[in-house]
Curated annotation (Swiss-Prot):
It comes from the Eukaryota. Pfam families: AhpC-TSA_2. InterPro entries: PXL2A/B/C (IPR032801). This is Uncharacterized protein T05H10.8.
Length: 377
C-alpha cells in the first residue's frame, strides 16, 4: 500500500515536471473597473519586459518556438483578460471595444481606457516586430489560415474552445486529450506515455494538444476559461527553433494579438452559456459534459473522427498510446494508397476547405531529450 502511494507521488511529480499547469486559484480580481484595468495594464507591460529579456538572452526564433507556437501565451494571458471581462461585465471582443470607445468621452474612465488601449497596442507592436524580423531571416509565413467547420460534436460538445485548438494546425490530424484532474494514477500514466510518444506522433504528422479545466475567476469561482491548454515543458534551442519555424511558422501577431486572445476568452464564455442551457435537458452522464468528464479524440483534418474515448468514473482505463499511434499510421497509409503511392509527402492541412473563422490556432511545437536553452517558470 505504502509502496503504491510512493509510486503515485513520484508519478505526480513527473507529470508536474513535464507540464506547465495553470494556476488552480485565481481570485485576485479588482474591486472596480479602474483597479482591474490597472492590473491588466501592469500585467501586459511586465510580460513585455520579461519576453524582451528572453529574446535578448536567446533569439526571436527561440521565443516564438517556446512561447508562441506552443500556445503558452494563451495560457498566460487569457485568465487575466477573463478577469477584465468579468469586472467590466462584457462577454465579447465587440463589447470590450464598445466600452473602450465609450470611455473616450467619459472623464472618469478616459485615462484608464487610454492606458488599457496603449498596453494592448504595445503588445501587438511587439508581436508585429517579431513577425517582421523573422520574415527577413526565415521568409514569409507559409501556412495559410484554414479551419474546420465549427465543431460538429467533437467529444459530444459544441466546443468553440476545442475548435480553437483544432483549427489552423499545420498537421494532418490532431490528438486532443481533455484532463479534468491530475491526481489520478491512470490519468498521469496516460500523460507520461503520451509525452514519450509525442515526437513519434509529430513525425507522423499528428499534432498533440492537452487541455484541462480553466482556473476559477473571481470570488464567485465562476470558471470563465472553461478549457485551457497545458503546454509541455519541451523547449527548442536556437538551431531547433529555426529549423521548425522554417517549416511551420505561424504569425505571432495573428495567433496571439490582443484581439485574438480576447476571442479565446469570448469563445469560452459562449461555450459556458451553451453548457448552462443544456443542463436542464441533459443528465450529468451526458458526454456533453466533456469539460468535466475528460477524454481523448483523434481528428483527421478532413473532420473525420478517427478515435474517441470518454472518461468513465466507473472505469480506470484510458486509451493505449500504441493503439493511437497505429491509428495515425493507418490513416497515413490509407492516404498514401489513395494517392496511388505518390512520392509526394502528405500535404499540410489536407484538402480542408477554408471557411470563415472567429479565431485561429497555433500548433504546439516541442522536442524531447534536448537541453533547454531557457526556462519557463
Amino acid at each position: 500500500m505504502f509502496k503504491a502511494y510512493l509510486m503515485a507521488e513520484e508519478q505526480n511529480e513527473q507529470v508536474r515536471d513535464i507540464l506547465l499547469l495553470p494556476t488552480t486559484v485565481n481570485d485576485q480580481v479588482g474591486s472596480s473597473a479602474d483597479e482591474q484595468i490597472a492590473s491588466v495594464v501592469d500585467f501586459f507591460h511586465s510580460k513585455l519586459a520579461e519576453y524582451n529579456e528572453v529574446i535578448q538572452q536567446n533569439s526571436r526564433s527561440v521565443f516564438v518556438a517556446n512561447y508562441v507556437q506552443n500556445r503558452f501565451l494563451v495560457t498566460e494571458f487569457c485568465p487575466e483578460l477573463a478577469k477584465l471581462f468579468d469586472v467590466l461585465k462584457v462577454k465579447s471582443l465587440e463589447e470590450l471595444l464598445q466600452r473602450l470607445t465609450e470611455w473616450e468621452d467619459d472623464p472618469a474612465m478616459k485615462a484608464s481606457g487610454k492606458a488599457l488601449r496603449e498596453s494592448f497596442e504595445a503588445w501587438d507592436i511587439f508581436l508585429r516586430e517579431i513577425d517582421d524580423e523573422l520574415e527577413k531571416t526565415l521568409g514569409p509565413v507559409k501556412s495559410a489560415v484554414t479551419t474546420l467547420p465549427e465543431d460538429s460534436g467533437i467529444l459530444g460538445l459544441q466546443s468553440k474552445t476545442i475548435s480553437y485548438y483544432v483549427t489552423g494546425s499545420a498537421f494532418d490530424c490532431v490528438l486532443i486529450i481533455v484532463v479534468r484532474a491530475f491526481n489520478r494514477p491512470e490519468v498521469n500514466e496516460h500523460i507520461l506515455g503520451l509525452y514519450n510518444r509525442i515526437d513519434e506522433l509529430r513525425k507522423l504528422r499528428c499534432d498533440v494538444f492537452l487541455l484541462t479545466k480553466g482556473p476559477p475567476i473571481g470570488s464567485s469561482g465562476g470558471a470563465y476559461i472553461k478549457l485551457i491548454g497545458v503546454p509541455f515543458r519541451k523547449l527548442y534551442d536556437m538551431n531547433e527553433a529555426e529549423e521548425q519555424l522554417k517549416m511551420n511558422r505561424k504569425s505571432a501577431l495573428e495567433y496571439n494579438g490582443w484581439r485574438t486572445l480576447c476571442k479565446v476568452v469570448e469563445a469560452s464564455l459562449v461555450e459556458g452559456d451553451s453548457i448552462v442551457a443544456k443542463e436542464a435537458s441533459s443528465s450529468e452522464d451526458s458526454v456533453s459534459y466533456i469539460s468535466q468528464k475528460g477524454g481523448t479524440v483523434l481528428v483527421d483534418k478532413s473532420g473525420e473522427i478517427l478515435y474517441k474515448h470518454i472518461e468513465d468514473d466507473k472505469s480506470d482505463s484510458w486509451p493505449d498510446i500504441d493503439e493511437i499511434v497505429k491509428l495515425v499510421e493507418a490513416r497515413n497509409a490509407k492516404y498514401l494508397e489513395s494517392t496511388n503511392n505518390s512520392t509526394i509527402s502528405i500535404p499540410k492541412g489536407g484538402n480542408l476547405a477554408k471557411v470563415n473563422s472567429e479565431i485561429s490556432v497555433t500548433k504546439e511545437l516541442a522536442t524531447d531529450k534536448k537541453k533547454p536553452c531557457c526556462v519557463i517558470s
